[in-house]
Amino acid sequence: MKHKTIALLLALCLLLTLAGCSKDAGQTAVPAASGEEPSGQKSSEYDFPDVRFFDATLLDGSAVTAEDLFDGKDVTVINCWATWCPPCLDEMDELADFEKTLPDNVQLVTYCVDGAQHTDECAQILEDAGFEGTTMISATGDFTTLIEQMQYVPTTIFVDGVGRQTCDSLIGSPSDLAEAYTERIDAALKAAGKSGL
């Protein structure tokens, strides 16, 4: 009986590790909001609030607003991850490959929740994976609300050209990232009257 209990506990621990990492396990707090007031509103039944108003710092040190980030994009995929999260690191190569296949009206952006504290490590992880897209390392406004409501990383949300959620988010690493992302991006594009991928 004792061996069965131990085996069951080990299996449960492995399952939790593969599914995602608790955000609180290694994340430091996101700085308080500045600039525009966060809306904190959900556009519909989706998991998290919209991210319509925020200022962010990118990995290269430049500043960007929500309006700048979403400009000209019908769909933005935002993958929130951490340098201390094994499932996040495991999916990074697949994220990098997927990002390179996207058309001009769709973008994949990453947000490293501990990137402001571990900038060099974040940059090295992305470089090793070959990720060439945009990476945020800190953000305020609506992004603060999003991060406060997230319980696990990786968490991926899908938003339209103004930061409204367009479909269900993904919590954890899907077994087939490209398929899961494509399904959600297609749904978002079709809802906007556009052709899918």
Language-model segments: residues:
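Positively charged n-region of N-terminal signal peptides that target proteins for export
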Residues: 1-10
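C-terminal motif of bacterial Sec signal peptides marking the signal peptidase cleavage site
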Residues: 16-20
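N-proximal helix/coil linker or "cap" segments that precede and/or mark the start of modular domains
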Residues: 22-53, 70-72, 116-117, 123-124
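A short beta-strand-turn-helix
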Residues: 53-76, 100
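Short active-site neighborhood of thiol/selenol oxidoreductases, capturing the structured segment around
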Residues: 65-89, 108-109
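Structural microenvironment flanking redox-active thiols in thiol-disulfide oxidoreductases
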Residues: 89-129, 140-145
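Short, internal strand/loop/helix patches
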Residues: 123-162, 170
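Thiol-/selenol-based redox modules, centered on thioredoxin-like
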Residues: 158-197
